[in-house]
């Protein structure tokens, strides 16, 4: 899948789940399941509940996403 097919949203982590999965509330109010991108996992970026994150969604499944950036 190319980078052009990805939809980006800002959101907030509301719950941490096992296996680096997170429940994220998007800015439009929807709640999705998201996992950490490989580069964030490699660099040991820690994500806690309440963190602002940037999430990538595919147009094929809008209920799952990938966290690509952690804000302050």
Curated annotation (Swiss-Prot):
Keywords: Cytoplasm, Initiation factor, Protein biosynthesis, RNA-binding, rRNA-binding. It comes from the Bacteria. Its main location: cytoplasm. The keyword rRNA-binding applies. It is found in: Cytoplasm. One of its GO terms (molecular function) is ribosome binding. Residues 1-72 form the S1-like domain. Component of the 30S ribosomal translation pre-initiation complex which assembles on the 30S ribosome in the order IF-2 and IF-3, IF-1 and N-formylmethionyl-tRNA(fMet); mRNA recruitment can occur at any time during PIC assembly. One of the essential components for the initiation of protein synthesis. Stabilizes the binding of IF-2 and IF-3 on the 30S subunit to which N-formylmethionyl-tRNA(fMet) subsequently binds. Helps modulate mRNA selection, yielding the 30S pre-initiation complex (PIC). Upon addition of the 50S ribosomal subunit IF-1, IF-2 and IF-3 are released leaving the mature 70S translation initiation complex. This is Translation initiation factor IF-1. It comes from Hydrogenovibrio crunogenus (strain DSM 25203 / XCL-2).
């Amino acid at each position: 899948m190319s980078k052009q097919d990805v939809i980006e949203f800002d959101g907030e982590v509301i719950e941490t789940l096992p296996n680096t999965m997170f429940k994220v509330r998007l800015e439009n109010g929807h709640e999705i399941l998201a996992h950490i991108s490989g580069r964030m996992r490699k660099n040991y970026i820690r994500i806690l509940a309440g963190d602002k994150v940037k999430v990538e969604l595919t147009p094929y499944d809008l209920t799952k996403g990938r966290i690509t950036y952690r804000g302050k």
